[in-house]
Every structure is written in C-alpha cells, then in structure tokens.
C-alpha cells in the first residue's frame, strides 16, 4: 500500500467578497504559511487576491 502524500486540498477564496473560489492542492511541508495569489475573478471581471481557506 502506498504512503499518503503531503499534499492537502485547499480552497482559494476571492478577496472581492463575490463568493467565487478556486480549488487546488499545496504541499504543507514546503509551504506551511497561508497561500495568497492574484487570480482572475469572473464575477467582477478583474484580477484580485485570493486567500487560502479550508475545504469543508
């Protein structure tokens, strides 16, 4: 049986408060801090900062 990986599923939530989010994975060992990345929000049709949140 294979070992479990280090990657964890996360949700990137828009800081524009539109409710839009992306899902991705990240390696907890290499990136212990919360992820912030600039991506396109199709609701406001602009690039905004997306912040990491847990998937429920």
UniProtKB/Swiss-Prot annotation:
Keywords, alphabetical: Ribonucleoprotein, Ribosomal protein
Family the entry assigns: Belongs to the bacterial ribosomal protein bL33 family.
Keyword Transmembrane: no
GO cellular component, one term: cytosolic large ribosomal subunit
Name of the protein in question: Large ribosomal subunit protein bL33
Cited PANTHER family: 54S RIBOSOMAL PROTEIN L39, MITOCHONDRIAL (PTHR15238), LARGE RIBOSOMAL SUBUNIT PROTEIN BL33M (PTHR15238:SF1)
Gene that encodes the chain: rpmG
Gene3D superfamilies: Ribosomal protein L33
NCBIfam families: PRK00595.1 (NF001860), rpmG_bact (TIGR01023)
Gene Ontology biological process terms in this record: translation
Molecular function terms from GO: structural constituent of ribosome
InterPro entries: Ribosomal_bL33, Ribosomal_bL33_CS, Ribosomal_bL33_sf, Ribosomal_zn-bd
């Amino acid at each position: 049986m294979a070992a479990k990986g280090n990657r964890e599923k996360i949700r990137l939530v828009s800081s524009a408060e539109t409710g839009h989010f992306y899902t991705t994975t990240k390696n907890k060992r290499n990136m212990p801090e919360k992820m912030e990345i600039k991506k396109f929000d199709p609701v406001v049709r602009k690039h905004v900062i997306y912040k990491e949140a847990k998937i429920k």
